């Protein structure tokens, strides 16, 4: 059996996000505002499905954080619950006490994203009993966060009502940022096999990834193949995987059932290894060893994992797998892994992105065919190349993202942008995505001049803002946002 490593700690994409909550107040403002805002906030978090950590009502005056003593209590609670807390939400029902808030965060030292919200004043309630002045207080709080070097996320509007749809959207955005930051800082990526010798483009630095909290767990491809060969054809896990494959897409009648069986066994072993090592994503040596030494492609196994929120990248592109994971955490949508592959006639802002492919079915957006690799099939023999997931990606919104370890500079760099998939035809085999991106030539120039790989991760929604906030502000990677 494969060895077990430490506990896998990536939050599931669909799991609850937990916020540490700080409600601020300042003594000469009406304390009722703080009490009411706390009640409104907790009701909203409950309704939206978020968990939270907050001081008990009787722990401080007015159920809020104001004094240094309050801050010490709140920070101690946050430290006790630090493994649960994905981010901190700071709410200002009134001007708030900047020292109480910044002292809480400084003492807790959670190193998680922080959201700062300030409540709106009403024109008919700016007397002594009703005025909030949070519009001003937010500036003071943010000034202190800046002084202490604590990065934070702002709401879309400078002030907003806690019960508003705008604040609900702010919380959703912030929760996604928290998922990306927590997920990547604790990510465990499987590297199955060695990179293709001909592709130096996918070389990377494990040490730079580890510096951001990303652990790479390698395994020799021979171990995977050896265990796949030892599996009994009638094993329950194999039969279940065969059923899953048959329901996943259309398999042409010409395909030998034994080749489907090989694919099922390979998938079972890879799944088991991923589970045993508590891995969040993988990158696989998908040619030519697995075809020559085992007799099938790896694409379908990768597609099936991706469909279950375990992204898998081609050609042992480990950093590509991290890029896919980032998109998954930001969007909740299954990502694909593609080559920037072809121009599209004379359309300057359109290109064809392709792979053999390992596209998950949800990423494809329509039914898929499962057949042989085309180019490799010609040289390696089609009988050794079953397992390619084929089709044309359906039209719709798209976000693309790619990170890379820049060993010459000792940094992690990335690029990011949004575009759309189109239904324009492209008569090529494999997985095809025709993409429209504004100022595409400018983007390609940036990739060329800055040494980025030919691989890119994409997902079927717009989520660039979330990734930009998480990566540039909290992870500290060098980021180019296109467009």
Feature locations, PLM:
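Cap/lid and interdomain-hinge subdomains that line or gate substrate/regulatory clefts
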Residues: 14-20, 52-53, 122-240, 246-255
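Extended hydrophobic packing segments that form well-structured cores
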Residues: 39, 380-483
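N-terminal beta-loop-helix "entrance" segment that forms/cooperates
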Residues: 52-77, 226-235
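Glycine-rich, highly charged phosphate/nucleotide-binding loops
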Residues: 63-83, 97, 262-269
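Periplasmic-binding protein-like
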Residues: 84-94, 115-117, 279-285
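Short, acidic/small-residue loops that bind anionic groups at enzyme active sites
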Residues: 102-131, 139-144, 303-316
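Long, internal scaffold/assembly segments composed of regular secondary structure
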Residues: 240-330
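C-terminal catalytic subdomain
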Residues: 306-423
């Amino acid at each position: 059996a494969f060895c077990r490593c430490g506990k896998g700690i990536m939050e599931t994409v669909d799991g609850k996000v937990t916020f540490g909550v700080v409600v601020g107040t300042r003594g000469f403002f009406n304390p009722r505002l703080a009490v009411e805002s706390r009640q409104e906030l907790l009701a909203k978090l409950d309704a939206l499905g978020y968990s939270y950590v907050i001081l008990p009502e009787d722990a401080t005056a007015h159920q809020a954080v104001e004094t240094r003593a309050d801050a010490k209590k709140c920070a101690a609670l946050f430290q006790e619950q630090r493994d649960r807390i994905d981010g901190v939400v700071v709410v200002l029902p009134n001007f708030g006490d900047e020292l109480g808030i910044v002292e809480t965060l400084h003492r807790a030292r959670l190193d998680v994203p922080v959201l700062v919200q300030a409540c709106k004043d009403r024109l008919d309630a700016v007397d002594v009993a009703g005025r909030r002045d949070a519009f001003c207080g937010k500036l003071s709080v943010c000034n202190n966060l800046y002084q202490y070097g604590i990065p934070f996320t702002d709401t879309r509007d400078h002030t907003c009502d806690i019960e508003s749809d705008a604040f609900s959207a702010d919380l959703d955005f912030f929760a996604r940022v928290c998922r990306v930051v927590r997920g990547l800082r604790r990510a465990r990526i499987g590297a199955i096999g060695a990179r293709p010798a001909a592709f130096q483009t996918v070389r990377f630095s494990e040490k730079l990834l580890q510096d951001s909290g990303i652990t790479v767990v390698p395994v020799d491809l021979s171990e995977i193949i050896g265990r796949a060969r030892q599996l009994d054809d009638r094993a329950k896990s194999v039969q279940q995987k065969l059923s899953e494959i048959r329901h996943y897409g259309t398999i042409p009648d010409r395909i030998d059932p034994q080749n489907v069986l090989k694919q099922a066994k390979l998938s079972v072993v890879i799944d088991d290894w991923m589970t045993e090592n508590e891995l969040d994503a993988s990158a696989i040596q998908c040619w030519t060893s697995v075809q020559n030494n085992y007799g099938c492609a790896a694409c379908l196994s990768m597609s099936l994992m991706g469909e279950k929120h375990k992204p898998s990248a081609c050609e042992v592109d480990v950093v590509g797998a991290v890029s896919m994971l980032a998109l998954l955490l930001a969007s909740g949508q299954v990502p694909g892994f593609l080559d920037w592959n072809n121009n599209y006639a004379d359309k300057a802002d359109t290109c064809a992105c392709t792979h053999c492919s390992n596209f998950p079915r949800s990423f494809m957006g329509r039914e898929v065919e499962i057949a042989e690799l085309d180019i490799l099939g010609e040289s390696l023999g089609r009988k050794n190349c079953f397992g390619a997931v084929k089709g044309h990606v359906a039209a719709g919104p798209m976000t693309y993202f790619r990170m890379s370890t820049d060993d010459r500079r000792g940094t992690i760099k990335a690029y990011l942008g949004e575009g759309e998939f189109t239904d324009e035809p492209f008569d090529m085999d494999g997985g095809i995505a025709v993409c429209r991106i504004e100022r595409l030539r400018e983007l390609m120039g940036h990739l060329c001049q800055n040494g980025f790989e030919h691989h890119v991760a994409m997902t079927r929604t717009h989520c660039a803002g979330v990734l930009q906030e998480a990566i540039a502000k909290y992870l500290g990677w060098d980021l180019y946002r296109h467009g």
